Amino acid sequence: MSQEPICQEPMSNVTVRSVPSDNSASNPLDKIVIESATLAARLARPELLELTPYQSARRLGGKGDIWINANESPFNNVAVGELDLTKLNRYPECQPPALINAYSQYSGVVESKIVASRGADEAIELLIRAFCIPGIDSIATFGPTYGMYAISAQTFNVGVKALSLSAEYGLPADFATAARGAKLVFICNPNNPTGTVIDKARIEQAIQALPDSIVVVDEAYIEFCPEYSVADLLETYPNLVVLRTLSKAFALAGARCGFLLANEEIIEIIMRVIAPYPVPLPVSEVAEQALSPAGIARMKTQVKELNTQGERLAAALNLYCEQWGGAVLKPNGNYVLAEFDDVAKVAKLLTDNGIVARAYKDPRLAKAIRFSFSSQVDTDRLVSLFESQKR
């Protein structure tokens, strides 16, 4: 019986090569590998070919020994007790009851309004997948802000109303008109990367003014300014969602554990699209310990220390900007954003001294650099470096 040809029609941009089998380099039945540089492009969703992926601190990389570009905690916390890993051969609970209970006790939000996720990033994606129709619906953001809202939307072919914050980094006067029609309206508070905050009353106005949208308040850094949280408004407003994470104040960025807080109707929809096992057993164990009384006490102590070091760094940056031109925004998270008239000079100064901070391509942040708060040792070096530039 004759064998049909592998390819009856010529294919463009295709390379066919022979790969020796594992048994013998001279085996006549060598494996045939067809390589095509355009196969993925031909099969991919067209909108993804134009998508620029989110440039995380890890993707951007850098060289140095002081890493203050990702708003990570300098504290490498070990577990406060023994981890129970005796069930690693079994799939974990979708929503580990002990973890949900621990976060409920910490946040004051009832368990039925909590979903645990792989960081707040997954929660953002879940909301877009659950509520936005690709090619039809849109989200709204107020920038400059965290880039993953827009990236997640674009990944699912959901439109983005990229609105601007006011000159004072608050919600603009026409926010309700500008955001109207968006299924999801994202407000980052404290805002990343500016570190600025929006008053609780102003956010409540937004929730009231957009009854047909879900207002998503990202509180990733709320432990640094808890008085600005709107989690207590969940009982009042069915269109409010609050995002939280253990990556920042709890120093568990590597664990990837976040929470979505919302009314039960929204939670029920989210649970329809969430992965069956989103929280690995070791992550749940570590997170539960972080949310124990001892873990929370440690977090609060570390937040206080980070705020102290942040105040020192902000003061040094202010002195530099007074002499060389620029401005420093008042920090409310574990980072501070400074705008420099001589930003290229500052960037080189940091690079030459092994310091990796965060710069931006956004035109609104062309002169800005964000500095994460770090240890006393790191802060000593930063303060000394900027003080050495005195005229």
Curated annotation (Swiss-Prot):
First-level EC class: transferase
Catalytically driven reaction(s): L-histidinol phosphate + 2-oxoglutarate = 3-(imidazol-4-yl)-2-oxopropyl phosphate + L-glutamate
InterPro entries the UniProt entry points to: Aminotrans_II_pyridoxalP_BS, Aminotransferase_I/II_large, HisP_aminotrans, PyrdxlP-dep_Trfase, PyrdxlP-dep_Trfase_major, PyrdxlP-dep_Trfase_small
Gene3D superfamilies the UniProt entry points to: Aspartate Aminotransferase, domain 1, Type I PLP-dependent aspartate aminotransferase-like (Major domain)
GO molecular function: histidinol-phosphate transaminase activity; pyridoxal phosphate binding
Reported cofactor(s): pyridoxal 5'-phosphate
The keyword ATP-binding is annotated on this UniProt entry: no
Keyword Nuclease listed: no
Pathway listed: Amino-acid biosynthesis; L-histidine biosynthesis; L-histidine from 5-phospho-alpha-D-ribose 1-diphosphate: step 7/9
Source superkingdom: Bacteria
Record PTM N6-(pyridoxal phosphate)lysine, positions in chain: K248
Pfam family, one: Aminotran_1_2
Stored SUPFAM superfamilies: PLP-dependent transferases
GO BP: L-histidine biosynthetic process
UniProt EC number: 2.6.1.9
Membership in a protein family: Belongs to the class-II pyridoxal-phosphate-dependent aminotransferase family. Histidinol-phosphate aminotransferase subfamily.
Subunit structure: Homodimer.
Name of the protein this chain belongs to: Histidinol-phosphate aminotransferase
Species of the source: Shewanella oneidensis (strain ATCC 700550 / JCM 31522 / CIP 106686 / LMG 19005 / NCIMB 14063 / MR-1)
Organism classification: Bacteria, Pseudomonadati, Pseudomonadota, Gammaproteobacteria, Alteromonadales
